[in-house]
Structures are given as structure tokens and as C-alpha cells.
């Protein structure tokens, strides 16, 4: 896979030095392998969901021949330990969707990260209706847009599901970016990406646009 940088073992003079480098190499390989397994597991889960008539957003005419979503190749460049800053003073607001429906959200925090030589910020939201359900008590919603939209990815942007971190760091993995359901079926109502979450870079990771032909 592209961008997967493995630590090469240097030829060491002593056995002790060689064991040190071998251990470092092994630890790095395990870290990368674990990240890849996590991404591939996400892709499998998505495909299983789309194949299942009980959970698939696809109309029957598309689901019956469905095999797999189109993903970018896993790329750990887009798996980032980002800074997380809470915004406890934020007030609820109504987020527009692709229909007349609106969702009540609160800006729960700001995510700051470095990618492609520059610093970027994204707002992350907590849905006030979902908050009433215990299983969503630590759920955060991150809609974002980037320069791939309308070309390689869905024109309306993509989403990430996150969990409230315990500290001030959060794992931001764009390999798990997915399309809103309305990208597959117009019957769904999907939150629109706020203008402050429009990135001026291309995020070539996650799910690509759905080809209906």
C-alpha cells in the first residue's frame, strides 16, 4: 500500500545493536499492520451493511447486484492523532439537511490537525436527539468537504463517526470517511456540510463516489 513507511533495519556491528533495530522494526510493522486491519475491517463492515436488505440504503435495483463499495486504498497518512479542544459554551443550533428537515446540533469541539504541510481545523458535532439514547452518549458527528468532492467522491461531502476522547487528542482516520445515505437513495435526509468544515485539500481516503451505471 502506498504511503506505508516501514522502518528499515540498519546493519549493526554488535548483536545488541541488531536486536535493538529488529525490535524497533517489529514494533513499527505491528503498528502499521494493526492500522491496516482496522481500516479493512471497516470496509468489510460497510460492504456487509450494504449487502443486507435490512440495513442497506441502496434501492433494490442496485442492491441485488452489489458487490463492494469503491474505496481508496488504505493510506495511514490520513490516520492522524489530532488535537481536540472542547467548546463547552457552544449553544444548540439547527443544522440544515438535504430536505426540509433540520437536526439540532451542538459544536462539541474543534479538531486541529496537520496534513500535507498545513494546519486544518474542523468542527465536530453532538446531535441533541441522539444524545437521549445511551448508546450514543459518547458519539460525535464530523461532516466535511474536500477537493475530491464532485470528482472522485460524492459532491455533497462525506461523514466521519467519532467517539468523545478522554483527553485532548483524538484519532482522525479519513480512511473511514463514508458517504451520506442520500448519495445512494434520495429518500434519505442528510445533514449538509457546514462551510467551516470545507477543507482546501484533497482527502484521497475513505469511500469514493457511488457509480449507479
Summary of predicted features, one role per range:
Residues 88-155:
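Mid-length scaffold segments of soluble, non-membrane domains
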Residues 1-7:
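Sec-dependent signal peptide recognition
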Residues 61-66, 93-94, 104, 196:
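Extracellular/lumen-exposed scaffold segments
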Residues 141-178:
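Acidic, glycine-rich flexible loop segments
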Amino acid at each position: 500500500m502506498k504511503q506505508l513507511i516501514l522502518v528499515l533495519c540498519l546493519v549493526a556491528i554488535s548483536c545488541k545493536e541488531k536486536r535493538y533495530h529488529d525490535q524497533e522494526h517489529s514494533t513499527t510493522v505491528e503498528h502499521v499492520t494493526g492500522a491496516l486491519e482496522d481500516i479493512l475491517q471497516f470496509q468489510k463492515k460497510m460492504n456487509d451493511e450494504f449487502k443486507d436488505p435490512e440495513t442497506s440504503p441502496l434501492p433494490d435495483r442496485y442492491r441485488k447486484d452489489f458487490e463492494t463499495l469503491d474505496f481508496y486504498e488504505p493510506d495511514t497518512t490520513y490516520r492522524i492523532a489530532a488535537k481536540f479542544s472542547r467548546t463547552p459554551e457552544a449553544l444548540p443550533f439547527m443544522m440544515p439537511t438535504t430536505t426540509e428537515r433540520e437536526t439540532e446540533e451542538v459544536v462539541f469541539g474543534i479538531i486541529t490537525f496537520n496534513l500535507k504541510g498545513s494546519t486544518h481545523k474542523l468542527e465536530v458535532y453532538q446531535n441533541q436527539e441522539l444524545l437521549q439514547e445511551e448508546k450514543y452518549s459518547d458519539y460525535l458527528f464530523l461532516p466535511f468537504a474536500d477537493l475530491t468532492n464532485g470528482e472522485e467522491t460524492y459532491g455533497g461531502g462525506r461523514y466521519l463517526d467519532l467517539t468523545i476522547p478522554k483527553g485532548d487528542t483524538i484519532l482522525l482516520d479519513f480512511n473511514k470517511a463514508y458517504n451520506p445515505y442520500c448519495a445512494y437513495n434520495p429518500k434519505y435526509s442528510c445533514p449538509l456540510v457546514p462551510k467551516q468544515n470545507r477543507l482546501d485539500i484533497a482527502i484521497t481516503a475513505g469511500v469514493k463516489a457511488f457509480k449507479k451505471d
